[in-house]
């Protein structure tokens, strides 16, 4: 049987740079990698099924968008392969309604929200003008289980009619009706941050919600602006979800409260800034990959002891 340290399945063309960096950094440490794409998924699935091929770790950036990768995911879940972001934990973590309640229980600040059931379960919900007045206007409408890139999210809603219309659009999904959170300004910058949890370590960056541009957050800035709580909040979310790798968005508002506004994104957009103006700073991408490398080395070492 051929055994590789890490297999990565992906279908999005813009993942290529991220995957290339992973291969380069891991192979420099004599860690073997295996890439799975649409052209070889059937062959790989067959070889894994027949136990001719095996992986110690698996990153799946494909089966959520391409059913051809689902069988391999099922097989590897039954083997000793360590799945980066266990599927069961992902399903729990991407449910915004569940995360909203669990974050509150963990002491995290979240936007005031109203959770409403799927249209397929309850056609009519009782929402009043008074409910909207508490939310404020505009407010945000979010499907609870539709994830990635703001899909299905309405950020400038004003009326009950918009809520009712959106419920029909995704009739099997719960919805969060959420107050809009506004960041304070820190020396001319919006205090909006995207934070990664990357294999045991938090990484925080500036992220402008209007321009979608990243900037590295320096240690001096973190100290001067009192932003170390970003790392603590991200660590708390990691404990709640049990995921290995995800991103979240946290806002510092004008009451000096850190508010988690976009709960968990398990499929992080890892386009690099040197090639994409709205990409993740290259240094941060390298840091995340080095965290992955160290996680694999540490886990292999522990398994060899056991």
Model-inferred region functions:
Residues 2-9:
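Extreme N-terminal starter segment of soluble prokaryotic enzymes
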Residues 11-122, 127:
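Conserved N-proximal alpha/beta basic substrate-recognition cap immediately N-terminal to
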Residues 103-104, 129-151, 172-187:
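ATP-grasp fold ATP-binding core
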Residues 112, 139-165:
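Glycine-rich phosphate-binding loop of ATP-grasp-fold ATP-dependent ligases
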Residues 139, 176, 203-204, 246, ...:
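Protein kinase-like catalytic core scaffold
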Residues 153-241:
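Phosphate-binding site of ATP-dependent enzymes
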Residues 243-255:
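A short glycine-rich, hydrophobically flanked beta-strand micro-motif that places a catalytic Asp/Glu
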Residues 252-306:
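C-terminal active-site "lid" helix and adjoining low-complexity regulatory extension at the edge
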